[in-house]
């Protein structure tokens, strides 16, 4: 049985005090939820201030990106060791906004995934097609390329902790949502690619999250599908009540 993951990507929102206020609001609302793994991903500057606030809440801490070198002359970058030091246990890698605005490629995703795993962080590896790719009928081709490129060179044992997030780029921050059927079709395909890469057992165990305008009113339908194991939530994770409602989707 795959334990669902609900991860909140705060993107470029929330100062230290705003983040602490959000955790203060969120923590009691998700208290006692043991059936779901809860993760929040603040900006780098906020990471070190949250572990104390999250203690005893069952909420894990993720970074929104990582660099593949441990240290060196890489201005502006943060290494896996430094993220661990700041209290993170997870890291989002290859988010569509990183690909769109900052030149992220399959090659850099692959380096980051390997570095994160070596540094004992759980990678949340994001893949997804643009509207152009979907309309051209290239969804599966894009997903397979991104998956194989991002996970290249990993053994089945190394892959085991990895979480995959499917985020159709056309549904991020647009208010458009992939239908439950569209999302399930993509997730089933992703699981099939993983089976080809690492075997059926690995594919059966990997958690595949859906990301793309997830809200309290659509999460239940998405989570009812057999290959959807959670959500990577953007805007709706910035308010305690809406994020808690998503976390408690099964109630």
Curated annotation (Swiss-Prot):
Its EC number is 5.3.1.1. Signal peptide: none annotated. Pathway: Carbohydrate biosynthesis; gluconeogenesis; Carbohydrate degradation; glycolysis; D-glyceraldehyde 3-phosphate from glycerone phosphate: step 1/1. It is found in: Cytoplasm. InterPro entries: Aldolase_TIM, TIM_sf, TrioseP_Isoase_bac/euk, Triosephosphate_isomerase, Triosephosphate_isomerase_AS. The keyword Isomerase applies. GO terms for cellular component: cytosol. The active site is at 95 (electrophile), 167 (proton acceptor). One of its GO terms (biological process) is glyceraldehyde-3-phosphate biosynthetic process. It holds the Pfam family TIM. It catalyses: D-glyceraldehyde 3-phosphate = dihydroxyacetone phosphate. It is an enzyme of class 5 (isomerase). Keywords: Cytoplasm, Gluconeogenesis, Glycolysis, Isomerase. Substrate binds at residues 9-11, 173, 213, 234-235. The keyword Magnesium does not apply. One of its GO terms (molecular function) is triose-phosphate isomerase activity. It comes from the Bacteria. PANTHER family: TRIOSEPHOSPHATE ISOMERASE. Belongs to the triosephosphate isomerase family. Homodimer. Involved in the gluconeogenesis. Catalyzes stereospecifically the conversion of dihydroxyacetone phosphate (DHAP) to D-glyceraldehyde-3-phosphate (G3P). This is Triosephosphate isomerase. It comes from Citrifermentans bemidjiense (strain ATCC BAA-1014 / DSM 16622 / JCM 12645 / Bem).
